[in-house]
Amino acid sequence: MEKLYNIADTTLKKLTKAGADFGYVMASITEKHEFNADGEKFTLLRTTYNNSLGLCGYKDHKKGTTNINSFDKEAIDKAVADCISFAAEGKEDEAYAIYPKQDNEDFKQGELVPDTDKFFKRVTELVDTINKDYPQVLIYELIASYDKSSSVYMNTNETVYTKESGKYSLVLEFCAKEGETVTSLSGTGFETLDLDTPFIEQAMVKQDIESIVEQLNVKALNGKLEDATVIFTPACMAQMLMFYFGTYIGESSVLEKTSPLYDKLGCEVCDKRITFKSAPKDKRIVCGASFSSEGRAVKDTTYIENGVLKAFPISLYTANKTGFEAPYCNSYIPVVEAGEKSIEDIIKETKNGILVGSYSGGHPAGNGDFSGVAKNSFLIEDGRKVYALSEAMISGNLGDMLNNVVDISKETLEDGSMVMPYIACKKIVVAGK
């Protein structure tokens, strides 16, 4: 950490000497221990180290940024010169700013020393379990890694943050095959600090694998479903909420005043059961953000509480441009409050609808309209899953969807990056051939 501190300190001094009125730097070293598997075989085992140095300088109300992957003196000197040059070519804007001096903090998160033997055993156990218990499932790719990061942040207001974090992660891509029938690829994954629980039992790995086996027998949906209920799995709901985040309350939509909710702060904007936070400090989030590049420690921030819009996830720059208050966290680290019913009961109470595992489509229009393919989906009739669907389409409006919530499950996906329930909605068109 001392090495990173000295690099950050030296770089910041060079940046100010070169003419920056204010700015910040962050020096980081990342360490990755990675296992890859293809089918039953492990194909890669490696450890890599990477350096990163980010610079941001402001001169005459203009901004310049650059990033390099070297700590060599010559590389740093060039990066400083480039940063000042980029600022000189930038557009003048008095809204550029960093936060005043904050209390210096040292952050430590997760496992700073990996148990690689136990981690490898858990990964091997997962591969063996899939091959034994789900013979139809073919592992296309498995990437398991332990990632450690050490960083030092400094700015010209003399705020200094240091951070060390370490976590395990797994990404799994797979399909199912029976005879000549092969499903499309599906995926699952998580970030964790827990090596005591088998990986098949973490996040929704088991549910996702079982779901792909059910996809071996698919049928096309004919026509439209009238007055359908669409139940989004947690992973799919995270997709839809990310679209909502960007279109309705995100940085660019607020800055450009294209947000449909621009004048709705403090107003009810969706179903009262929706409470949506960005929560890097939640204990279920693994190694969440600790501070912003503008020089302030982050805190959990509620954007929507009981359906009421409480804040926009914007930067200090956008806050200065618009007059809205910048929250303590403007990243997408979603934690959505769970409901009271089980997903089993929600399905039982659904007369006509579909369960959607993932969504494939373009980015929604500026007004929130969306249209795309409902992938890994199932038809629901009279309270039960009937069969897997192929080529089903869903279309609607994100705002209307969240204003027509049928129910929210008590079960949640906790994969280290989010906490998300199943959410059932109306006002969505479901169509087949």
Q: Across the structure, where does each feature detected by a protein language model lie?
A:
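Acidic low-complexity segments
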Residues: 4-13, 20-32, 77-163, 196-238
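Short beta-strand elements
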Residues: 46-59, 161-191, 303-305, 374-381
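N-terminal alpha-helical targeting/anchoring segments
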Residues: 32-88
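A generic local secondary-structure boundary/capping motif
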Residues: 13-15, 42-46, 127-134, 156-164, ...
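Amphipathic alpha-helical
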Residues: 250-269
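Dual-mode signal for accessory low-complexity, basic/Gly-rich regions
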Residues: 264-433
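Structured beta-strand/loop patches that form or line metal/cofactor-binding pockets in enzymes
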Residues: 20-53, 141-161, 352-374
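Short, acidic (Asp/Glu-rich) active-site segment that either coordinates a divalent metal cofactor
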Residues: 62-63, 171-202, 267-273, 309-331
